[in-house]
Amino acid sequence: MLKITVDLFSGRPNPTWIMDDKRGGDLLKKISRKKQIISRSDKGYNGLGFRGIKLELLGDEPSSNKLPSTFKIADGLAKDQKASIDLAREIVDQMTRYERTNMDVFRLTPIDRRIQKVILGSIEQYQRDLKRIQKYIRIKIRWPISPIRVTVNDSECPNCQYEESRFNPDFWNADPYVMANNNCYNYGRNWKTNTFAQPGRHSGATASSMSCPAVKTAAMNDGLVERCDCLPQSEYPRRLVALVIAPGIDYHWYRKQTGGFWGHKPGPTAARNYDNSGVLITDPQTCDRGAGTYLNYTDFCGFFYAGKSVIIS
């Protein structure tokens, strides 16, 4: 069998389905005849928006097609970009035939025509942005040496304090399992749960929609408070985080670090401190959060504090 994952979202789980042996085998044969359309699954584009389609063999039988057990298409690295993108569209065009498959992830990300439309639109935007994406792939994470953790006075809120910590992307990026199973909400709260944490899951109700009010309510039920609602010293360490929304589609979180910048972790990809243009993030309200009409994190929902009593799962 062949597992298909569209690498797309930052907060909610990515669209995923499983092809049976016949369909999966036919697809692999097609790919094997044109291997210049594939790339390694961990080296391509990893910003906000469409990041390619991951294909993963679920059995240990040696592949007669001599393909790796896990690889990607349409992630910015394939030698034949056009053919790689065309195949991505072809796979997504057929995804709704799997919408009745029983997978736990479908509760948060159904494989339906609405998600299909978002993916196809995001692929179109990806193709338009391909030159920018290929430049982005070459960017190296950079960070200054700074104190491990400091308490700062919030410049926007008299009498409020919070903690900033040193940017430490290797904590999230060095282990492939950790990187794949923790998302932007984990990064914002600074808690590695390995559950791809969702706002409200621990407190009993995830967001009813991908909107500022719904995701905000779910996160506050986990214990976050709005900025300027000062947290006491007993909540140390208190993080300053920011929430943005791709309306109706997805959410994303940022966390303030020492050094005057913000870090984030788009979905199962690497933690970093730069935006979709490769620019160091000094303000999540104005940084590049995507483009196009299908998956663009246009709505800024506000700043929040996350104290030590915030529990996520």
What are these regions (language model features)?
Residues 1-148:
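Function-determining sites in protein domains
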Residues 17-20, 24, 177-181, 208-212, ...:
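Solvent-exposed, acidic/flexible segments
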Residues 37-38, 63, 195-198, 249-264, ...:
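Substrate-binding/catalytic groove segments of enzymes
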Residues 38-46, 195-207, 226-236, 242:
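Surface-exposed patches in mature extracellular/periplasmic domains of secreted proteins
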Residues 103-144, 260-313:
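Active-site or metal-binding loop neighborhoods of secreted/extracellular toxin and effector enzymes
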Residues 146-225:
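Cysteine-nucleophile protease catalytic domains, especially the papain-like/related folds used
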Residues 208-269:
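...with weaker cross-activation on analogous glycine-rich loops/strands in unrelated enzymes
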